[in-house]
Structure formats: structure tokens, C-alpha cells
């Protein structure tokens, strides 16, 4: 916690805003004060207005928007409505939700130097600021790289560096680590916390991945339907779990576990949880540990048997990249069978997105071959797979060009001359919970809603093979589970890239782990998650509940399994009523 808090640096009063083309008001009477040096986590369901609120801090709204705006926003005592964006940008730096919306330079160096150059700094000072900023985000070795060659997580690092080079008083960050691997996320968050503590920079960070940000935050603010409904110190916020549950927000696993077991505490890590399990009567109830494993529960997504099942996708010795001198994939061998749900995980830049592009026939192998439905992608026109493969890019905006979400869902079926276009569009929009937005302009929606629009646009063609690149980005827990449940219920063949190991464990029948262009693990989630060496190589970490279960000597991979194991060991344990494990 930063002890150097000063006067109020952000003051928002009765803020209202409605986007052009939207019937519903996005921000509804927001009142918020943030003191200098605070680290504030802003969260809430997808589409509740978080990103819009951030855009008001540096004047993007209302100066670059034609929407309906009213209210007052003061940054360091300056009214944003009366100030130019150049002046505001010196005080409030904004890291966008999508790095592709922010990056416009051709090289990493030019992107990071742009801000200091516009502040008319000397060349020597600019070079030092670029060096320092890239070092802080772990991108020093990429200074001369093309921004187009970077992975999504690397682009996010560059966007953060471009703001750090200007050292603003306020750093407003919109899901800045959503495309980073877990190790990279912790690295960046540690850097941000150091800046908060040592430089007294005020941090306002929007994120759905509450479990990763909560340990760093002084304060938690929750929005819903354009309003602030909870504003409390981080140490107190999780005493109101019913609010998180009602809104479908993911609570840190240790907090959920302690609440389930009736322990009055809100630990954010496995390490903080261990001492709580050693206290008083609770230790007597769960017995001495480690002990013999508790009851072994079946996994949420059992392993897949490929016996007597011809592969839908067959990859042999695949070498692929965007430049012959720099291969991204190096000797990939892989089979995917009908009905499998395969999670692809690994470090940023390990080749996950490149693998998906090859499976979509959008890239052709430099060496080796990829066969989809038995057809070699080297000899087939990519358009021949249209209607059979549904692909959603990491950045959904690359796919959205129609004037409404309904038109997006109709576009594919219309081009393919399919029947029942209206019904197909309705079903796909309904499946993604955006039927109520069918007349809305996609560009006016939140990133999570835009991503679900992109998914709906491929569901309407009913593809045989579904490929999703980071489908959990910008999504709250309810929408993630609803999307993945849809594919699970339909028995879809699904390959999805993700850094979310909990979602991979819950929904994937199989997990591939990649590192430096190669598959280093391929198996059931339970088996992969136990291999600490593999996880370390891929910059992945075990979920806290798995660490806690191991500490207790129980073979469990979810809170439900862990609690069942504890009850099996000692039936006298009482579970808090009404808690959803």
C-alpha cells in the first residue's frame, strides 16, 4: 500500500455520457474521487462503462467524441472540458484496451519515443526515456523490431512503455495485461506497483482478472450498468462476495475457498492461505497434513480418446512464419479429432496465434504440411474452407465492418448463400447474449461485446472447426462460461489460445503448451498442471487452489473438488451456506 497519498488528483462529479448511435446511456451520474498515489482497481461486468470512464480522464471523451456529455471531471484541479488534450496527456496517460488501437509507429523505438518527442524533449533525453521505459517492461531487446511482428502481449508492453516514457501523474490502464502470460503479468504489475510506490504515480487499472490485480490494489471500485455500486479498500471489498457473485465477477480462489470454509479472511495467494488453515479448530477438523489424498473427483473436461476416430486436423513437421529467415513454428506435429476442445497455452511470442492461422489455412507452411478435413492447405485455396472453419482474431475489430451486430451475424450466411439467415443470426446473437444489441453499431460496444459479436458472426455459419484466439479477453466470468458452455454442449471441435489456466482446466479436453515455436506438452489438464517444469518453461503458474490442495495432500483441481476432499476426510466440516464453488 502506498503511504504517500496526497490531495485529490481525480475528481468526477455527476458524470453522464451516451455514445452516438446508442440508445442506452453508458455513464449514469458517476461520482468518484481518487487521491494522489492511490492504486485503484476498477472492475465490473462487460459493457458496464469502465473503458468509457477511463477515456474521460485524458479528454478523449468529450473532445474526440460526438456523444452526449455532462458533468465535471477535474484532473489535478483542471477541468478536462476546458483543457486541451496535449495538456491533459502530460497529467493522465491512458493505455488502451486494444494495443492495435494505440500503436501506429512502424518500430518499437518510434512508438515509445512519440510522446517525449511531442513534449519537445532533447534527443539525448528522449533516447534515455525510451531505454528506461523498454527496460521497465522487459522489451529492451526489441527496440528496433517492427511493431507488426510482435505478439499481443508484447504489443501491450510497448503501449505501457510509451506511457511510462512520459511519466504522467496518473496512469489509467484498460486491461493492460489481458494478452500477457501469467509470468509477464506479474512482471508488469510489479513494475507498476514500484512506480506507484516510489514515484507516487496514481494508478487506475481496469481489469476482469481481479485475482491478479487485487494483491496490488489499495482500493476496489465496482461498476454495473453505468453506475458505481461498490467503492471500498481492497482489504474490505471481498467481504461483500454476494456483489461479485451477482455480477458474475471472478473472485480470487483463496478468498472464495476461505469464504466457503467459513474462515473470515481474504487472502489473495496460496501462501497467505496456508497459515489460515493451521489455526484453531479448523486444523483439528481437516486433520494433519499432508495426508492420504481425499476422494478423487472426475475432471470437468475429461481426456479425449481418439480410438477409431480419424483426425479432423493433421499437422506434420510444420515450419511456418512471416519471414523465411525467421521461423515462428519449428517442427510442429499435431492431430485434432472431431469433438475435441483444445486449449493452446504458452509464453507470449511462442507461436500460438501463428499455429491457429495455419489451422485456419490463412498461412501456408514453409515446410511440412497441414491437412484439414483431409485436404492439404498447401494445394487448396483458403476460400475453399469458408463455411467449414470459423476463426476469431485476437483483435475482434479486424472482423467487424457492418453497421449493426445483426448485420455482422448475417454477413457470413449471406455470402455463403445459406438458408434461414434471419434465424441463424438470431440464434448466434442469442447464444452470445447480445441479441438486445442487434441494432447497435459494433464500434460503439465494449471490447467484450465486440468479441462476442465476432464469435456470433462465425456461429451463424455453423462451422465444423472453431478457432478462437484469446476468447476470454475483455470478458467477465459469466460471459466466458456462457460462451464455452455453448461449444461444450454442442460438441464443437474447438481450438482456443488462452493464458487463463482455470478456463483451460474447466473446458479443454486437452491442453497444448508451447514454447519458442514448439509444443513442449500435450495432454489432459490435470497432467499438464502438475508438471512444474513445463509450467515454468511456458511462463505459466498453478492456480492457487491446486497449490493449496497439494499442501493439504488432496488431489483436487477446483474449489469444489478441494472442499469435497476436505469433507471426505472429516465430515464435521461445515460449509458456508449459499456459496457457489
Swiss-Prot record:
Its EC number is 7.-.-.-. Pfam families: ABC_tran. It comes from the Archaea. It is a peripheral membrane protein. Its main location: membrane. The keyword ATP-binding applies. This is Putative ABC transporter ATP-binding protein MM_1996. ATP 2 binds at residues 346-353. Probably part of an ABC transporter complex. Responsible for energy coupling to the transport system. GO terms for cellular component: ATP-binding cassette (ABC) transporter complex. Belongs to the ABC transporter superfamily. SUPFAM superfamilies: P-loop containing nucleoside triphosphate hydrolases. The keyword Membrane applies. Residues 300-309 have a biased composition (Polar residues). GO terms for molecular function: ATP binding; ATP hydrolysis activity; ATPase-coupled transmembrane transporter activity. ATP 1 binds at residues 44-51. Residues 287-309 are annotated as: Disordered. Keywords: ATP-binding, Cell membrane, Membrane, Nucleotide-binding, Repeat, Translocase, Transport. Residues 10-250, 313-541 form the ABC transporter domain. NCBIfam families: PRK13648.1. It is found in: Cell membrane.
Amino acid at each position: 500500500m502506498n503511504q504517500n497519498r496526497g490531495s485529490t488528483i481525480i475528481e468526477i462529479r455527476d458524470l453522464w455520457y451516451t455514445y452516438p448511435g446508442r440508445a442506452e446511456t453508458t455513464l449514469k451520474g458517476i461520482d468518484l474521487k481518487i487521491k494522489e498515489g492511490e492504486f485503484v482497481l476498477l472492475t465490473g461486468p462487460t459493457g458496464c462503462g469502465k473503458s468509457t470512464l477511463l477515456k474521460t480522464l485524458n479528454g478523449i471523451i468529450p473532445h474526440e467524441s460526438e456523444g452526449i456529455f455532462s458533468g465535471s471531471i477535474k484532473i489535478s484541479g483542471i477541468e478536462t472540458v476546458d483543457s486541451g488534450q496535449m495538456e491533459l496527456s502530460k497529467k493522465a496517460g491512458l493505455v488502451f484496451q486494444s494495443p492495435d488501437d494505440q500503436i501506429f509507429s512502424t518500430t518499437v523505438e518510434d512508438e515509445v519515443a512519440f510522446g517525449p518527442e511531442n513534449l519537445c524533449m532533447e534527443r539525448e533525453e528522449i533516447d534515455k526515456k525510451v531505454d528506461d521505459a523498454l527496460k521497465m517492461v522487459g522489451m529492451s531487446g526489441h527496440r528496433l523490431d517492427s511493431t507488426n511482428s510482435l505478439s499481443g502481449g508484447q504489443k501491450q508492453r510497448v503501449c505501457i512503455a510509451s506511457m511510462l516514457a512520459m511519466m504522467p501523474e496518473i496512469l489509467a490502464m484498460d486491461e493492460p495485461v489481458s494478452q500477457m502470460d501469467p509470468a509477464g503479468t506479474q512482471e508488469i504489475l510489479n513494475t507498476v506497483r514500484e512506480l506507484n510506490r516510489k514515484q507516487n504515480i496514481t494508478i487506475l487499472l481496469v481489469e476482469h482478472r481481479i485475482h491478479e490485480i487485487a494483491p496490488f490494489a489499495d482500493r476496489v471500485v465496482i461498476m454495473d450498468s453505468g453506475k458505481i455500486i461498490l467503492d471500498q479498500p481492497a482489504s474490505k471489498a471481498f467481504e461483500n462476495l454476494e456483489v461479485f457473485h451477482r455480477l458474475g465477477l471472478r473472485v480470487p480462489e483463496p478468498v472464495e475457498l476461505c469464504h466457503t470454509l467459513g474462515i473470515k479472511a481474504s487472502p489473495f495467494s496460496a501462501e497467505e492461505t496456508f497459515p489460515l488453515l493451521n489455526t484453531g479448530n479448523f486444523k483439528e477438523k481437516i486433520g494433519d497434513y499432508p495426508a492420504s489424498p481425499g476422494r478423487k473427483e472426475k475432471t470437468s473436461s475429461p481426456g479425449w480418446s481418439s480410438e477409431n476416430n480419424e483426425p479432423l486436423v493433421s499437422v506434420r513437421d510444420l515450419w511456418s512464419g512471416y519471414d523465411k529467415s525467421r521461423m515462428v513454428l519449428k517442427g510442429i506435429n499435431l492431430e485434432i479429432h472431431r469433438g475435441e476442445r483444445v486449449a493452446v497455452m504458452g509464453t507470449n511470442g511462442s507461436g500460438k496465434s501463428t499455429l491457429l492461422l495455419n489451422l485456419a489455412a490463412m498461412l501456408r507452411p514453409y515446410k511440412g504440411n497441414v491437412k484439414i478435413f483431409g485436404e492439404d492447405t498447401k494445394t487448396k485455396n483458403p476460400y475453399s474452407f469458408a463455411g467449414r472453419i470459423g476463426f476469431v482474431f485476437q483483435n475482434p475489430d479486424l472482423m467487424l465492418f457492418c453497421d449493426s451486430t445483426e448485420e455482422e451475424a448475417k454477413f457470413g450466411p449471406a455470402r455463403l448463400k445459406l438458408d434461414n439467415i434471419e434465424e441463424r443470426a438470431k440464434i448466434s446473437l442469442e447464444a452470445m447474449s447480445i441479441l438486445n444489441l442487434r441494432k447497435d453499431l459494433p464500434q460503439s460496444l465494449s471490447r467484450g461485446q465486440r468479441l462476442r459479436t465476432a464469435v456470433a458472426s462465425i456461429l451463424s455459419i455453423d462451422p465444423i472447426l472453431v478457432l478462437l484466439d484469446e476468447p476470454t479477453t475483455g470478458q467477465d466470468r459469466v460471459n466466458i462460461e456462457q460462451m464455452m458452455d455453448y461449444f461444450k454442449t454442442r460438441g464443437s471441435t474447438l481450438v482456443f489460445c488462452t493464458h487463463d489456466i482455470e478456463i483451460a482446466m474447466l473446458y479443454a479436453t486437452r491442453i497444448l503448451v508451447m514454447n519458442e515455436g514448439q509444443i513442449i506438452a500435450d495432454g489432459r489438464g490435470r497432467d499438464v498442471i502438475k508438471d512444474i517444469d513445463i509450467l515454468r518453461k511456458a511462463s505459466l503458474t498453478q492456480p492457487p487452489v491446486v497449490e493449496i490442495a497439494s499442501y493439504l495432500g488432496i488431489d483436487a483441481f477446483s474449489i469444489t473438488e478441494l472442499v469435497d476432499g476436505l469433507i471426505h476426510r472429516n465430515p464435521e466440516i461445515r460449509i458456508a451456506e449459499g456459496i457457489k464453488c
